[in-house]
Amino acid sequence: MIVCCGEALIDMLPRQSQAGETAFAPYAGGAIFNTAIALGRLGIPTGFFTGLSDDMFGDILRETLKSSNVDFAPSATLSLHTTLAFVKLVNGSATYAFFDENTAGRMITTEHLPALGDFCEALHFGAISLIPEPCGSTYEAL
């Protein structure tokens, strides 16, 4: 099994409401999350480790992982918010506003590290989750 380790977040993509107002729709995302989803959909045994929130956005992330055949049992569930990334599109180019302070993904610590047995053949890390603390040190310890 390949265990992907890193951020899972909700991309809030711009839409237009029925009244013509600007609105946002939630979509599961994150660089490493998307890698895990792709591997799972290709039928490659895949696990995912991060901090997942027990909020409604965490439910979206877990359902997306489950429906893509990704084992999220290695992930920790925390009673903190999910990271949100609001997206602004201008001429096809995206800019982001991230809301990540004290979120489930960012606040995982070495106490949340999973026991990876012989089933784990490879770990895949990457993206922004390797930088902030305490999650950066947690991934390094894994």
Predicted regions and their residues:
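Glycine/Thr-rich phosphate-binding loops of Rossmann-like dinucleotide-binding domains
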Residues: M12, P132-E133
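Conserved N-terminal subdomain of the carbohydrate kinase-like
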Residues: P45-I128, P132
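Generic recognition of cysteine residues
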Residues: C4-C5, C120, C135
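Charged helix-capping and loop-helix junction motifs
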Residues: G136-L142
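Glycine-rich phosphate/adenosyl-contacting loop at the front of the ribokinase-like
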Residues: M1-V70
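A conditional alpha-helix N-cap/helix-loop micro-motif detector
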Residues: A28-G29, R106, C135-G136
